[in-house]
UniProtKB/Swiss-Prot annotation:
Gene3D superfamilies: 3.30.420.40, Phosphorylase Kinase, domain 1 (3.30.200.20), Transferase(Phosphotransferase) domain 1 (1.10.510.10). It comes from the Archaea. Component of the KEOPS complex that consists of Kae1, Bud32, Cgi121 and Pcc1; the whole complex dimerizes. It is an enzyme of class 2 (transferase). Binds 1 Fe(2+) ion per subunit. L-threonylcarbamoyladenylate binds at Y134, V135, S136, G137, A138, D166, G179, E183, N262. It is found in: Cytoplasm. Keywords: Acyltransferase, ATP-binding, Cytoplasm, Iron, Kinase, Metal-binding, Multifunctional enzyme, Nucleotide-binding, Serine/threonine-protein kinase, Transferase, tRNA processing. InterPro entries: ATPase_NBD, Bud32, Gcp-like_dom, KAE1/TsaD, Kae1_archaea_euk, Kinase-like_dom_sf, Prot_kinase_dom, RIO_dom. Required for the formation of a threonylcarbamoyl group on adenosine at position 37 (t(6)A37) in tRNAs that read codons beginning with adenine. Is a component of the KEOPS complex that is probably involved in the transfer of the threonylcarbamoyl moiety of threonylcarbamoyl-AMP (TC-AMP) to the N6 group of A37. The Kae1 domain likely plays a direct catalytic role in this reaction. The Bud32 domain probably displays kinase activity that regulates Kae1 function. It comes from Methanosarcina barkeri (strain Fusaro / DSM 804). Residues 340-545 form the Protein kinase domain. Its main location: cytoplasm. This is Probable bifunctional tRNA threonylcarbamoyladenosine biosynthesis protein.
Length: 545
């Protein structure tokens, strides 16, 4: 059988890179990297760099391929990074791809840059159906495949982790790229400095962390600030990845994107996966940053599934979302799925009910033989001890206080019996998380519950279908560790956005679920329309920048 040969061109930002691949082999790859004289990336200068070197990169690539017996006439398609990325750079690369397509008389394939990072990781590791932590300059996302798309479980609400690191590095007068310099300085630190740790459900925010780190430089050594920045930011993304693992029930984590070259981040992810019994995969470093091979290989998958473009449809998209892409090359029946459960499952005292991202949950016997649920926030080996103890203590107290307060406002929650430093004892409710059986009717009831919560001035902070329990005809809200008091539109909007993101990433009927939620939310919360409008604004904000 004849091999399929695809030529791919990457050029979303810094790197102009082209490669030729088959299903099993990288034939050749040539890269020219834009290096600004000072500061960060200048989109127009980067595009000029790509235009200057495009012809020579392709010429060198074809020459290397010829040495391996691959002629231009053997190439079956031209793949290019269609987005997301910097508009001027994308347009330059698309022009080069169109010219090659016309001259060779072969189809074009428009590749999503983010998905290419995922597919190269799956190709170059044993990963089959992973939760993906994708961290690059402009992107920070937790992603997994479901129902014909790569779904985004959580992402940055402001700035990508790589750009946040670079921004801090520039303020500290460190040369570009900032990430490796921060990593090097962090190795010589002697002290951890308290910095803000911001997680909103499965979403993240890095802007406040960067500002606080820059302020800390006025009083603390650079080494200590770099170390503290890394430990805090990386713990945040690892926790969000663990939350996605717990929610989906998947057993693999794949690290993708340029920030993934950081040794400490890899170490933390490996520690988290070992503790959960999950497998951790990361491709070799040459495939972590932007490269032509990932575009070529993803283009090959798309080509073989009949996914090509006409010239008229080859316009670039600087804001091309991961979850906008119809994934035509994955066979659904081969993917692992979370086993469903049903009410009435027999549970034994002391048996582990749940190993969540926050805590382990088990039963113990209370007075008169009554079952009591124990939620214990165990140490996380991947987190620096001071961060870990602070988070566990704060969340334990917050959960006890706001869960009880929510009950007083008509929101069904378990009754808290006792509070210890890292442990809660509460009413055991024999129910099922709605992630296994959510319907539009249930979603409408969820909307009513959240409306009552917001009317009381409480923001849950972690609204997912894993944290809502159905017992009989009643819904219970669980896991208030990230909850807080806030009557602002932004806080309430993020709260609802997190839930909608869970619907979209996990449930095939997400559109019906969202509309049903809105109906119930409007019924119990007077300012619902303002919040729902803000949700749309937040959704647009969480885009490639």
């Amino acid at each position: 059988m004849k091999n399929t040969f695809i030529l791919g061109i990457e050029g979303t930002a810094w790197n102009l890179s082209a490669a030729i691949v088959t299903e099993t082999e990288i034939i050749a790859e040539v890269t020219e990297t834009y290096k600004p004289t000072a500061g960060g990336i200048h989109p127009r200068e980067a595009a000029q760099h790509h235009a200057k070197y495009a012809a020579s990169v392709i010429k060198r690539l074809l020459a290397e391929a010829k040495e391996k017996g691959v002629k231009p006439s053997d190439i079956d398609g031209i793949a290019f990074s269609q987005g997301p990325g910097l508009g001027p750079c994308l347009r330059t690369v698309a022009t080069a791809a169109r010219m090659l397509s016309i001259s060779l008389g072969i189809p074009l394939i428009g590749v999503n840059h983010c998905i290419a990072h995922i597919e190269i990781g799956i190709w170059r590791t044993p990963a089959m159906d992973p939760v993906v932590l994708y961290v690059s300059g402009a992107n920070s996302q937790v992603i997994s495949y479901m129902g014909g798309r790569y779904r985004v479980f959580g992402e940055t609400l402001d700035i990508g982790l790589g750009n946040a690191l670079d921004k801090f590095a520039r303020g500290a007068n460190l040369p570009h790229p900032g990430g490796p310099k921060i990593e090097a300085y962090a190795k010589n630190a002697t002290k951890y400095i308290h910095l803000p740790y911001v997680i909103k459900g499965m979403d993240l925010s890095f802007s406040g962390l960067s500002t606080a780190a820059s302020e800390a430089l006025k009083k603390a050594p650079l080494e200590d600030v770099c170390y503290s920045y890394q430990e805090t930011a990386f713990a945040m993304v690892v926790e969000v990845a663990e939350r996605a693992l717990a929610h989906t029930g998947k057993k693999e984590v794949l690290l993708a994107g340029g920030v993934g070259a950081n040794t400490r981040l890899r170490e933390m992810l490996n520690d988290m996966c070992e503790a959960r019994g999950a497998k951790f995969y990361v491709p070799e470093k040459r495939f972590m940053g932007d490269n032509g091979t990932m575009i070529a290989y993803t283009g090959l998958l798309m080509y073989k599934s009949g996914n090509t473009l006409s010239l008229e449809d080859s316009r670039v998209n600087p804001s091309y979302r991961t979850d906008d892409v119809k994934v035509t090359w994955i066979q659904e029946e081969k993917m692992k799925r979370v086993p469903e459960i049903s009410p009435g499952t027999s549970l034994k005292l002391g048996e582990l009910l749940d190993n969540g991202a926050e805590a382990i949950v088990y039963l113990e016997e209370g007075p008169e033989g009554k079952k009591i649920l124990v939620k214990e926030r165990v140490p996380k080996a991947y987190r620096y001890k001071e961060i870990d103890e602070r988070i566990r203590t704060e969340r334990n107290r917050t959960e006890a206080r706001l869960m009880s307060e929510s009950r007083r406002h008509g929101v069904s929650t378990p009754i808290i019996y006792d509070v210890e430093d890292f442990k809660l004892k509460m009413q055991y409710i024999d129910g099922v998380p709605i992630k296994y059986l959510v319907t539009p009717e249930l979603s409408e009831k969820v909307g009513e519950l959240v409306g009552k919560l917001h009317s009381a001035g409480i923001v849950h902070g972690d609204l997912t279908t894993s944290n809502i329990l159905l017992a009989g005809e009643r819904l219970y809200l669980l896991d208030f560790g990230l909850a807080y008091y806030d009557k602002g539109l932004e806080a309430r909007g993020v709260d609802v956005h997190v839930l909608f993101q869970t619907f979209e990433s996990t449930h095939r009927n997400h559109e019906a679920l969202i509309e049903a939620f809105k109906k119930g939310y409007r019924r119990t919360f007077i300012d619902s329309e303002d919040v729902l409008t803000r949700v749309e604004e937040i959704k647009k904000r969480a885009r490639y920048a």
